[in-house]
Structures are given as C-alpha cells and as structure tokens.
Regions:
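N-terminal regulatory/effector-sensing and dimerization cores
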Residues: 68, 74-166
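Short helix-capping/hinge SLiMs at alpha-helix to coil transitions
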Residues: 255-257, 306
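Basic/polar phosphate-binding segments, predominantly the helix-turn-helix DNA-binding elements
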Residues: 259, 263-295, 309, 315-340, ...
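Short, Lys/Arg-enriched, Trp-marked, Pro/Gly-tolerant hinge/linker segments that flank
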Residues: 183-186, 204-214, 223-251, 255, ...
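A hydrophobic/aromatic-rich effector-binding and dimerization subdomain
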Residues: 2-21, 53-57, 61-68, 73-74, ...
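Generic protein-terminus/edge-of-domain signal
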Residues: 1-105
Length: 347
C-alpha cells in the first residue's frame, strides 16, 4: 500500500471517532450533553467497545495481552491508530506500548507527569505504568503494542546492546523497578516518518508473512533511534539509578549464567551475599536461584531457536550438568520439552 493511501485511511474518521467527536462537542452544552448521554445507543457502545466515562462499566483500568493479541505467539505486535477524540482514561497494561505522533499533536499523562507531544515525538511506556493519552482533535497518533515475550524472541540483538533503549526494556524484563517512560523528540525525521507509514500499511493489509515484515520495520525504528537520538531522550531521572542496577545484574547473569553463584555475583558488585540476595528480591520479586533459572532458560530458548546445537550441549552451555535436569526444568517453566520448543519455533 503506497503512502498516500495509508495516510488517507489514517486521516479518515472511523465510527468510533465520529462518536467520540460528537461526545466532545456535546460537552460544550450541559443541557445538550445530558440529552446526548440519554440517547446513546448501548448496542453501539458494546459493539465498538466505546469508552463513556459517565458509564463506569465501559471503563477499564487494566488491559491484557489477550485483548489485542491472538494465541499465535509469532504475532507479538499490534499496530493501530489511536482513536481521535477518545476520552483520556487512566489505565495500564501488561505489555509495552509505543506511540508516535505522525501528524498533529496530543497530550500524554504518566502518573503525575503531563507532556505535550507534537509531530515526530515518540514515547515508550512500560507495562504496569498508569497513563492516559488525549488526542483532542484529528491528529494522527500511531499506537504500537508489543508483547514482553516478543523482545526476548525477536529483538534479542537489540537487548544485548549497552544503551538507554536496551536498558529500558531490560529493566522491565528483569526488574519490578523499571523506568516508566522514554520520550524521543525526532522532529520531521523523514526516515522515521516513512517507517511508521510503512508499518501501518503492512498491518492494514496483512498480506502473507506480514508479521515478519512488521517485526523487521519495528527493528528498523529501534535502530534509527539508536543511531540518532540516544542523546536527546527524556526520562524520569529519579528512576534511573535503580533501573541501571537491575540491568547490570541481569547482564552479568546473562553473560555468566553457566557459572554464576550468589557469592560470585556479590563480589563482582562489591556487595555482601546477604545484601545481594535482598536486593535481587526487592528489584525482581525473585530469589537469586529463580532469577538465574529464568536467565538460563532464556539463553536456552535463544540457542534452541537460532542454532542446531544438540540439547545436551545447550544444557551444558547454559549451566546444567545434567541434561535430564535441564529438560525437566525447561518443561516445568516453558510447558514444552526443549526438542518440542525447537520444533514449534521452526514450524
């Protein structure tokens, strides 16, 4: 789909947006608004999942992956235009969100912080962070929702970098103390603009293998940000230190998963073992052994997907002396044997 057709579709108001525009216009007249609320078609509200703040049963505080993603784990990205005029309702979710102002402007609130966003601005939001987006006119804002598991499976190389973007995602994947948001001001960068238009076009058409191309375009967006905008990033500084500590520990365990011990990790960071154990529990909600097991199994998943190494060799490479113990542990946490996991990912 060419850029003109994509932009025409994005600029055309859909049924939900027409409702929300009428809702906003009605609010200018108290008497007119009361009449508007009384004549709302409840079937339309149900069918379109419309948000009507005056009807509490239409408001959700939490959104789950199952509401946006199919059970097919290969499709881990959902792309849509944020509906214009939607009432800005605070909410959170258990996946990552990225939104990009393609044209126009919007206002975004995260906890107590409000940002005015304009064309070219891009914002990453962590899971579990309460926020609200207000597109009060016919601006075009693109929403990209990304499963947490998608980062481990498809953006593994991005996570290996020592940069702010990688650390942002790592801090949530391995810690309960992540950075709430990152904002990039990219202005009229034509490469990013084209990438988001292409992303929307692919997702609208859903041709064969579209999910592969969607993953590739999102990777391209990440790379463009890494190349040009790491020094012009806005983030909550008060959360930076704790998140960096969590990331350093996670990276240490990724690199040394096969041989890591609590004592060795504590010595690396100049902690006592007791303090290191408490710190890991506070940051991740897991014990050292639980976190180490998580990292070892993620390393094993990557080797099963991307190499032809025998299962026994993978077990040894990630830190298991016994292949049988590795297979039992893998099956307990992943729900499949290592061979079954490899077969499923290559199907």
């Amino acid at each position: 789909m060419d850029e003109t057709r994509v932009m025409d579709q994005l600029r055309t108001l859909n049924e939900s947006e027409l409702f929300y525009r009428a809702y906003r216009l009605a609010k200018f007249s108290p008497s007119g608004f009361e009449a508007f609320i009384h004549q709302i078609d409840r079937e339309q509200v149900r069918r379109l999942n419309l948000l009507v703040p005056e009807w509490p049963d239409t408001i959700q505080a939490e959104y789950l992956e199952s509401q946006f993603f199919s059970p097919d784990r290969r499709v881990g990205i959902h792309v849509s235009k944020h509906n214009c005029y939607t009432p800005p309702v605070p909410h959170h979710h258990n996946f990552f969100e990225l939104f990009y102002v393609l044209e126009g402007r919007c206002s975004h609130q995260i906890r107590e912080h409000t940002s005015a966003m304009s064309a070219g601005d891009l914002c990453f939001i962590q899971p579990r962070v309460t926020h609200a987006l207000d597109v009060s006119d016919e601006s075009v804002v693109i929403d990209v929702l990304i499963r947490k598991s998608t980062f481990r499976h498809y953006f593994y190389s991005i996570l290996q970098g020592d940069n702010l973007l990688a650390n942002f995602f790592m801090s949530t994947l391995y810690s309960e103390r992540g950075i709430d948001y990152l904002i990039f001001h990219t202005g009229d960068d034509p490469a990013l603009h084209r990438a988001f238009v292409e992303l929307c076009g692919e997702y609208m058409e859903k041709q064969d293998y579209y999910s592969v191309l969607v993953n590739a375009i999102v990777t391209k967006i990440f790379v463009l940000l890494l190349r040009k905008y790491m020094d012009a990033c806005e983030l909550p500084q008060d959360q930076f230190h704790d998140s960096q500590t969590a990331v350093r520990i996670a990276r240490y365990l990724q690199t040394n998963a096969a041989t890591a011990t609590l004592g060795g990790m504590a010595a690396e960071f100049h902690y006592t073992p007791e303090y290191a154990s408490r710190l890991i529990k506070q940051m991740t909600g897991q014990t050292f052994i639980q976190l180490l097991t998580t990292v070892r199994l993620e390393n094993a998943e990557q080797l099963l997907r991307d190499t032809a190494m025998p299962v026994a060799d993978i077990a040894a490479a990630v830190g298991y002396e016994s292949s049988e113990h590795f297979i039992r542990t893998f099956r307990k946490h992943v729900g499949l044997t290592p061979s079954g996991y490899r077969q499923k990912k290559r199907a």
